[in-house]
Amino acid sequence: MYKRQPDIGIITNIGVSHIEYLGSRDGILKAKLEILEGMKKGAPLILNGDNDKLVTVREPDYKLVFFGIENPNVDFRAKDIEEKNGFTSFTVEFYGASQRVTVPTVGIHNVYDALAAFAVGYEMRMEPQKIAAGLKSFVPSGMRQRIKKVGGITVIEDCYNASPDSQKAALDVLSSFKSNRRIAVLGDMLELGKYSDVSHENVGKYTENKNIDILFTYGAKAKHIAEGAKGFVDEIKSFDDKTELAKALLETLKDGDAVLFKASRGMKLEDVINSLYRAVSYTHLR
């Protein structure tokens, strides 16, 4: 029993995270829709209208609100997306109106999240300008795509957790950096069950045309990322030991490089990041 009833529900994505326990993406959708059990009848349920599973949701007892980029029939749509100097700007079109929004982060996945937040604010009867101001003041929390400068190196901390979709999104972010070299440090993605090997390999294949110069993988499952990336990344190394990984990374990094760290929470890839920080002084990028 829910002691409190949420006023608004949000489901941002149906991917393959936790598929080991839920069996299929349909099983994941069913589990996420359990949020309705605690919501008041008629409350807004905000859904990603670009997701093939969420766009099929029909819940007549609730107010369905869709957001997206590709789907022209959503209620909140992002258009004219621009990335520059670590910021992303876009126009939100909604119910015949529009509002320009800027968020201090990059990556199309962050546009989706900002759209969901904008929709929440609107449902709470906030002024669009105030919603935009709030989004502009957003600060990423620890290990969730937080960007730092380590000497002359750009570090993208994004290892709070990982799924196939978020790994690919993180590679998109790394690819967007105008750096001397782009280095990806990718670890195991957990809870993928029978889809694990192919999911890791597909992440590796996703490096095609992403201009990733060096790929380091950590963990037994992530070796399949290395396999998938063959032919797309010039230098690939796999590690089972964090100390060896950290040592190799420190020997490889040069001023002007950008390095991404991404893995599931259980891999504790922040241990490698902390080894890097102990080796060199760092300041915030902004």
Protein language model annotation of sequence segments:
Residues T12, A117, A263-S264, T283:
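Conserved adenylation A10 loop of the ANL superfamily
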Residues G15-S17, N51-D52, N161-A162, M189-L190, ...:
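Short glycine-rich anion-binding loops that position phosphate/pyrophosphate groups of nucleotides
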